[in-house]
């Protein structure tokens, strides 16, 4: 028996690894291997043909089943209260969003409901959403604030996100998105809201250890380039990574700004220009594609996938779960839409929810690949090829999931 395997607490024999390793082509598929875990990390990955008994005490034969890294949903807004179903109905009848917003709908309706909910209520509302992702194979999820838009309500959302990670078998990364919209109280003075974010909310979130990163919605209906820079400077002062909702509805130059700040990722990108693409490529910033929002809003302007591919920009894929523009709680569906709507290959979609999604969260040294030394987050699938994970939607193919070396039986 291989010495490294003998040192493992658990060994999975006869797995077919789709490693998603950056140094291997396509899915990084290997012949049947034994995968050993020690102290929460992948400790050994050994070809079956090189093994001789005896096997360690805790082993199981997976009979050739496909194993992939755990899926990573790197952009969600899944903590919220209230429903926008009536708004959806009105929009299908042709009522413009501006009119809906004037009547109290839109994002501010979610803000009102989220402010009114206590932490326990928000936790209970978010619980089934996260459990749905877990059932699909998500082992890491990013959760943003952004529906509180006061100091206490933004922190409340972040506390709920942390609690979800403690209560469920999933790793949660948190992002402060106080610069999501201008709250009603600051409608006539948005610069004062930006000052509040920079001088009060970011310091409080950082000091409480509630935020892993800071995000800004940089758009003509959101925050200007100058305001975005202010928020990024404040985040940098507190040692927080930055991200950006960029170039979804127009191009303000936000992606270039974010790249200059060394952002982890810029997200949406339908209006990304060549200058922005080169900036992302130069700084190694991840382009996160959100096809569910594109689909739900019936957009027609596609993100420049071919240009991103040519420039070598890593492309992540995420669900963008939110009540207004992407009420679709399915990373697997986002993978499918990334292929069918945006033209990604299934290999790119799979890399987009593993290796590149890990980079979008700053976790590329720990997550997103099956590689010795990385955290033991992986999935066992009842399917013959990893392309099925982007192709066949709505069928439960997950056999089991492992996070930090601990197996969670599926179901």
Swiss-Prot record:
This is Imidazolonepropionase. One of its GO terms (cellular component) is cytoplasm. SUPFAM superfamilies: Composite domain of metallo-dependent hydrolases, Metallo-dependent hydrolases. Its cofactor is Zn(2+); Fe(3+). Pfam families: Amidohydro_1. Pathway: Amino-acid degradation; L-histidine degradation into L-glutamate; N-formimidoyl-L-glutamate from L-histidine: step 3/3. Keywords: Cytoplasm, Histidine metabolism, Hydrolase, Iron, Metal-binding, Zinc. Binds 1 zinc or iron ion per subunit. It catalyses: 4-imidazolone-5-propanoate + H2O = N-formimidoyl-L-glutamate. It is an enzyme of class 3 (hydrolase). Its EC number is 3.5.2.7. N-formimidoyl-L-glutamate binds at residues 147, 322, 324. Zn(2+) binds at residues 75, 77, 245, 320. Fe(3+) binds at residues 75, 77, 245, 320. GO terms for molecular function: imidazolonepropionase activity; iron ion binding; zinc ion binding. It comes from Aeromonas hydrophila subsp. hydrophila (strain ATCC 7966 / DSM 30187 / BCRC 13018 / CCUG 14551 / JCM 1027 / KCTC 2358 / NCIMB 9240 / NCTC 8049). One of its GO terms (biological process) is L-histidine catabolic process to glutamate and formate.
């Amino acid at each position: 028996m291989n010495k490294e395997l003998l040192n493992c607490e658990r060994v999975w024999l006869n797995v077919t690894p789709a490693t998603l390793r950056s140094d291997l082509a396509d899915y990084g598929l290997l012949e049947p291997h034994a995968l050993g875990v020690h102290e929460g990390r992948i400790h050994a990955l050994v070809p079956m043909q090189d093994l001789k008994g005896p096997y360690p005490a805790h082993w199981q034969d997976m009979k050739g089943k496909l194993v992939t890294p755990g899926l990573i949903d790197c952009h969600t807004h899944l903590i919220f209260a209230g429903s926008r179903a009536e708004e959806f109905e009105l929009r299908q009848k042709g009522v413009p969003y501006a009119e809906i917003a004037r009547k109290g709908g839109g994002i501010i309706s979610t803000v009102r409901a989220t402010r009114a909910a206590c932490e326990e209520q928000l936790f209970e509302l978010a619980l089934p959403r996260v459990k749905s992702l877990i059932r699909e194979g998500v082992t890491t999820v990013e959760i943003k604030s952004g529906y509180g838009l006061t100091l206490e309500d933004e922190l409340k959302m972040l506390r709920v996100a942390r609690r979800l990670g403690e209560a469920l078998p999933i790793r949660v990364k948190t992002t402060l998105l106080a610069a999501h919209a201008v709250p009603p109280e600051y409608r006539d003075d948005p610069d004062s809201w930006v000052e509040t974010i920079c001088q009060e909310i970011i310091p409080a979130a950082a000091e409480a250890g509630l935020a892993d990163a800071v995000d800004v919605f940089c758009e003509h209906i959101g925050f200007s380039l100058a305001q975005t820079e202010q928020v990024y400077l404040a985040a940098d002062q507190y040692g927080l990574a930055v991200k950006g909702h960029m170039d979804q509805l127009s191009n303000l130059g936000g992606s270039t700004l974010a790249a200059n700040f060394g952002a982890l990722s810029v997200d949406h990108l339908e209006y990304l220009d060549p200058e922005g693409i080169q900036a992302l490529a130069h700084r190694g910033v991840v382009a996160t594609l959100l096809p569910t929002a594109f689909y739900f809003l019936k957009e027609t302007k596609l993100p420049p996938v071919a240009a991103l591919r040519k420039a070598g920009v890593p492309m992540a894929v995420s669900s963008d779960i939110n009540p207004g523009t992407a009420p679709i709680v399915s990373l697997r569906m986002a993978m499918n839409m990334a292929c069918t709507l945006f033209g990604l290959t299934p290999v790119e979609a799979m890399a987009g929810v593993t290796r590149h999604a890990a980079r979008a969260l700053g976790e590329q040294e720990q997550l997103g690949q099956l590689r010795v030394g990385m955290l033991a987050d992986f999935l066992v699938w009842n399917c013959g090829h990893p392309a099925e994970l982007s192709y066949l939607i709505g069928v439960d193919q997950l056999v089991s999931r492992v996070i930090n070396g601990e197996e969670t039986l599926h179901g």
